[in-house]
């Protein structure tokens, strides 16, 4: 079973994480919030653009990371969990063959529906379902397999945070107006020119 294999491969790392001072719920919220912070400078149109085959739309990244928690933790391990939209299992799978059929990677940029607002509601739906599960992990030792899957899910989302940045960097660079991501201040002075330094001996 795919979830069992994933859990076995990441159990050692999650055991260490469980000993850290930061609780599971706090870590989950921090990682998810950082994804939102990365996307904060974007406008709606930025979320859906795809400028080359190796780029995925930002909207797809933020949906896919929620799909992971839903597919490998909530659906099989939380009795009574109901997906917000069962069709998302097909749309936002990537290359997890054992998890079912998936939308063609090359056509991710064709998907304007669900909307960006729909995707944020999807993330909120998954977050609401994950909250009591993570709170229980903080209160008890919990299930080692679940801890391993949560750890993997957080690492997976952090990987996609990097992909969000690299993909949107190419997308913004491809635009004639050269928009910038965020309003970070520019350097107040130029760097000093490089030069050789001589030492005796």
Stretches found by the model and what they are:
Residues 2-47:
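N-terminal regions that are enriched for targeting/export leaders
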Residues 3, 45-101, 136-190, 195-197:
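Short, contiguous alpha-helical
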Residues 21-28, 55-62, 85, 89, ...:
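Amphipathic, non-membrane alpha-helical segments in soluble helical-bundle scaffolds
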Residues 27, 94-140, 148-152:
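Acidic/histidine-rich alpha-helical segments that form the ligand environment
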Residues 200-201:
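Phosphate-binding active sites in nucleotide-utilizing proteins
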């Amino acid at each position: 079973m795919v979830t069992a294999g994933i859990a076995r491969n990441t159990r050692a790392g999650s055991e260490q994480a469980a000993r850290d001072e930061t609780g599971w719920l706090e870590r989950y919220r921090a990682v998810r919030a950082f994804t939102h912070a990365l996307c904060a400078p974007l406008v709606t149109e930025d979320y859906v653009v795809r400028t080359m085959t190796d780029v995925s739309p930002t909207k797809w990244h933020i949906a896919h990371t929620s799909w992971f928690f839903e597919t490998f933790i909530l659906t099989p391990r939380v009795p009574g969990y109901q997906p917000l939209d069962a069709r998302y299992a097909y749309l936002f799978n990537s290359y997890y063959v054992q998890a079912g059929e998936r939308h063609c990677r090359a056509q991710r940029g064709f998907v304007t529906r669900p909307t960006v607002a729909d995707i944020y509601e999807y993330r909120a739906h998954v977050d609401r379902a994950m909250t009591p599960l993570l709170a229980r992990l903080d209160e008890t030792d919990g299930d080692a397999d679940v801890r391993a899957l949560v750890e993997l899910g957080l690492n997976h989302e952090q990987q996609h945070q990097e992909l969000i940045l690299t993909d949107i960097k190419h997308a913004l660079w491809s635009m004639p107006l050269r928009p910038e991501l965020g309003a970070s201040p520019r350097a107040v002075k130029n760097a000093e020119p490089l030069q050789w330094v001589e030492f005796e001996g």
